[in-house]
Amino acid sequence: MKVRASVKPRCEYCRVIKRKGVLRVICSRQPKHKQRQG
């Protein structure tokens, strides 16, 4: 999980979702693409 100021989808399988007020990127194909805004 990477913590970034700016989260962006890195591939077509990445989804940007908001959980408990925190923006996250989850990816079904590449778990390495997981990000959280912080």
Curated annotation (Swiss-Prot):
Keywords noted in UniProt: Ribonucleoprotein, Ribosomal protein
GO biological process assignments: translation
Keyword ATP-binding: no
One term of GO molecular function: structural constituent of ribosome
InterPro entries noted in UniProt: Ribosomal_bL36, Ribosomal_bL36_sp
Keyword Ribosomal protein included in the entry's annotation: yes
GO cellular component: cytoplasm; ribonucleoprotein complex; ribosome
Pfam families in the record: Ribosomal_L36 (PF00444)
PANTHER family linked: 50S RIBOSOMAL PROTEIN L36, CHLOROPLASTIC, LARGE RIBOSOMAL SUBUNIT PROTEIN BL36C
Entry's family note: Belongs to the bacterial ribosomal protein bL36 family.
Name the record gives this protein: Large ribosomal subunit protein bL36
Organism: Roseiflexus sp. (strain RS-1)
Gene that this polypeptide is encoded by: rpmJ
